[in-house]
Amino acid sequence: MKQSKRLFRSAWCRKHWLAVILVCLLPAALWAQDNLPSQAVPDRHSVPIYPSREIRELMRFVAVSNPMPETFRDTLDNVITDPVGSLYPFWQKMSRMDHPLRIVHIGDSHVRGHLFPYVMRRCLEDDFGKDAVEDIPVDYRTSGLARETGKNGIVYHMLGVNGATCASFATPERLDEVIALHPDLIILSFGTNEAHGWRYVASEHEAALDRVITQLKESCPGVHFLLTTPPGAYVRNGRRGKRIPNPRTEKVVDTELRYAREHGLAIWDLYDTVGGKQQACRNWDNAGMFQRDKIHFTREGYILQGLLLHEAFIKAYNQYVATRLE
């Protein structure tokens, strides 16, 4: 009992003296603390968190993924070829996005089906904003023309004609329709029907390309162009023969590549990107992306084409942004 009292008394003494020490030291601690100002002093030394042009440009990069199926063989890097930088003024407009930026995608049934270019359109709207157009569902039965709101952003129009070649598309009515949209960029996707002409003549194809581009260039000041090559298709070997990869597709692609090179235009070579002469058709076919006619594509096939175009497009844009950092 006595031991318990001694322990209690000892503990009480320690607490008592600790309290005394704290009371004695408190005034000194308070005296050492600087007086707090009644109002915070403005920070005159810090700078904005993103002060440099390089950082501002770096923030314009757009993330993009590679949609190429792993089962596709002998593919090439998915890029837009533009050695003279013909699209640089367009990329500059895109990086600023201070007005509605109008893209008009013209072509054959691959464009007329709307799915291939619509995937591209939706991806660009996700990248740069969708306020420039009304959110109206698009399918095969609807118009491919976007309805503008007047706000800044991507305006992507789709004008395709079933069975069209570059030559047959170039009627005054259709060209006037393109011109009336005031495009900043025109994407031309022809070639499948040119390749299905049994008597394909490269010089005639090249002349048709030149007529269309020349007329549009004269009527649309400051417009830029992006050519695309066809995805590939099968034809019958004889009237009732087995279907084989269309041997004229390679000639059509060569014509379009040569025309782009000689006239300083940008081109996206879808055909060679997905396997070219040896593998393009086989890759599409093995993936189950052809329809029964082996010319047109399934929903999955057109979605993939739209994603591939978007990837190449954004990679070219990001390359432009990178040059601004140099």
Language model features: what each stretch is:
Residues 177, 192-210, 222, 227-254, ...:
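Serine-dependent acyl-ester chemistry module
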Residues 1-42:
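Bacterial Sec-dependent N-terminal signal peptides
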Residues 102, 110-207, 218:
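Conserved SGNH/GDSL esterase-like catalytic core that processes O-acyl groups on lipids
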Residues 232-326:
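Catalytic His-Asp segment of secreted/periplasmic serine-dependent ester chemistry enzymes
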